[in-house]
Design a protein with these regions (language model features):
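A short, proline-enriched helix->beta-strand linker immediately N-terminal to the Walker B motif
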Residues: 162-166
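Conserved ABC ATPase signature
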Residues: 143-147, 151
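Catalytic Walker B motif of ABC-type/P-loop ATPase nucleotide-binding domains
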Residues: 168-171
Length: 250
C-alpha cells in the first residue's frame, strides 16, 4: 500500500528526514512514535504530498508518486496524477480543520461533491452512515462551534472516510484534546483497525500503539532507528534512544 524508500527532506539548513524507508501492507496498522522534532509529522505530510521530499521514492498502491531523476533529485509525476494517487489516502490532523460555516453533514459531503463530482443525493446517505459509525448522527445539522474537541475529531475522521480512502494517515489525532475526550477518538480508530483499514498513526498514546498497532516505527533525528512488532518493541526495545524514550513516557 505504501512503499517509501530513502526519503530526504530539508527545511533550509535543517535536515528533517535522513534516508527514511517505510513499507506498509494492506490492512496493517503502523504506529510512528518518537520525541518531538524527530520528523514523524513531516514524514506523514511527505507521504500525502503536503510537503515535497528532496530525494527518495514513494509508491502508493504500486503507483509511483515520486522518484529520483538521473541527478538523484526527487521528481514528481504530473499534478493530475498526484491528485489521483493521493486521493486514495485520508488524513486526520491534530486540530480538526473543519469548515466552521458548514454543518457537520456539509463538512462530510463537500469533498466528495467538489473533488469526486458526486451528486448530493448519492453522498448524503453514505455521510449519514459514517456519522452513525462515529456516534454523531444526532449532530449532523450542528455547526462545529457547538461540538466538543472529541466530537470535532470524530467528524474529521468521518470526513476523511467520506472520500473512501484505502489508507488513513493520523497526525497525533488526540494531542489537542482534553485527556477526558481522547477515549472516544481512540475507540473510533480501534474500530477502523478492526475493519482492517490500513493506517499510519503518529501518536503519543502508547497504550493504543501497543494494543492496536501491528508494528511500531521509532523515529529519532530524522531516521527510523527501530522498527519491530508492537508488543516486542514495548517489552524489549533494542535501541538505546527508544529505551530512554519509553522510560519517560510509560
Amino acid at each position: 500500500m505504501i512503499d517509501a524508500r530513502d526519503l530526504h527532506k530539508r527545511f533550509g539548513s535543517l535536515q528533517v528526514l535522513s534516508g527514511v524507508s517505510l513499507r506498509i501492507d494492506q490492512g496493517e496498522v503502523v504506529a510512528l512514535i518518537g520525541p518531538s522534532g524527530s520528523g514523524k509529522s513531516t514524514l506523514l505530510r511527505c507521504l500525502n504530498h503536503l510537503e515535497l521530499v528532496d530525494q527518495g521514492e514513494i509508491r502508493i498502491n504500486g503507483e509511483t508518486l515520486v522518484a529520483n531523476d538521473a541527478q538523484g533529485r526527487a521528481r514528481y509525476v504530473s499534478e493530475s496524477e498526484v491528485r489521483r494517487i493521493c486521493r486514495r489516502m485520508g488524513m486526520v490532523f491534530q486540530h480538526f480543520n473543519l469548515f466552521p460555516h458548514f454543518t457537520v453533514l456539509e463538512n462530510l459531503i463537500e469533498a466528495p461533491i467538489t473533488v469526486k463530482g458526486m451528486k448530493r443525493d448519492e453522498i448524503v446517505p453514505h455521510a449519514e452512515e459514517l456519522l452513525r459509525k462515529v456516534g454523531l448522527f444526532d449532530k449532523r445539522n450542528a455547526y462545529p462551534g457547538r461540538l466538543s474537541g472529541g466530537q470535532k475529531q470524530r467528524v474529521a475522521i468521518a470526513r476523511a472516510l467520506a472520500m473512501e480512502p484505502d489508507i488513513m494517515l493520523f497526525d497525533e489525532p488526540t494531542s489537542a484534546l482534553d485527556p477526558e475526550l481522547t477515549g472516544e477518538v481512540l475507540r473510533t480508530m480501534r474500530q477502523l483497525a478492526q475493519e482492517h483499514m490500513t493506517m499510519l498513526v503518529v501518536t503519543h498514546e502508547m497504550a493504543f500503539a501497543r494494543e492496536v498497532a501491528h508494528r511500531v516505527c521509532f523515529m529519532d533525528k530524522g531516521q527510523i532507528v527501530e522498527e519491530r512488532a508492537a508488543r516486542a518493541f514495548f517489552e524489549d526495545p533494542h535501541h538505546e534512544r527508544a529505551r530512554a524514550f519509553l522510560e519517560h513516557v510509560l
